[in-house]
A protein has these predicted regions:
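Catalytic alpha-helical scaffold of carbohydrate-active enzymes acting on polysaccharides/glycoconjugates
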Residues: 2-122, 127-196
Length: 196
């Protein structure tokens, strides 16, 4: 008798950054900008591949990329994929003042709402670099999950607040009990893969 195949679950997500990450680092000359344009070349191929295999996934997109490539972003939505928040202009929140971070977060939410008809529930920080205020802001704006941290390979976990990082002694971990915010790579209800 052949052994039954195990059901395996994989999470596939994409960051459609285009040139935003390069521009956010001050790389605005023609060469890095052209390198960033390749995302727009690859995206239709990725959408076709996902369609071919019946895969629904999540695309994390900065607001400026939605403004730069509206038709491609509309194609993502039309194909039934989730659009997650990936900053306004791909500037890492850790490099922003708290009010700048909140302004970019709110602006990105509104742009995604215009694109999809609803506020995003998922967030992936530009350059995977959260600020000390990021978790508080994500909770304030009703996010369900964030997808920037990497403390576990496949199990969702609660995001902590209040970590204290020291260079001269051990790390002090903050508290995750009150956040309710998950760090996961997919939305459980949408993909039926992770039950929390």
């Amino acid at each position: 008798h052949p052994r039954p195949m195990k059901r395996l679950i994989a999470c596939i997500t994409f960051d459609f950054d285009a040139m935003s990450g390069l521009v956010a680092r001050g790389l605005t000359s023609p060469t890095p900008v052209s390198r960033g344009e390749f995302g727009a070349v690859a995206l239709p191929r990725i959408l076709a591949l996902m369609d071919r295999f019946g895969i629904k996934t999540s695309f994390f997109i900065p607001g400026v990329v939605i403004d730069t490539y509206p038709a491609l972003c509309e194609a993502i939505v039309k194909a039934g994929h989730e659009v997650g928040h990936h900053g306004w202009s791909h500037v890492p929140p850790a490099n922003l003042k708290p009010e700048e971070e909140e302004e970019g977060l709110a602006r990105g939410i509104e742009r995604i709402r215009q694109l999809t008809g609803k506020a995003p529930t998922g967030y992936r920080s530009p350059s995977w670099d959260l600020s000390p205020d990021s978790v508080r802001l994500l909770l304030k704006y009703g996010f369900y999950y964030e997808s920037s941290m990497m403390a576990h390979d496949h199990e969702p976990y609660r995001v902590r607040q209040g970590d204290k990082v020291h260079v001269d002694r051990g790390m002090e971990f903050g508290d995750a009990s009150g956040t309710g915010l998950l760090d996961i790579r997919m939305v459980p209800e949408r993909h039926n893969a992770v039950k929390v």
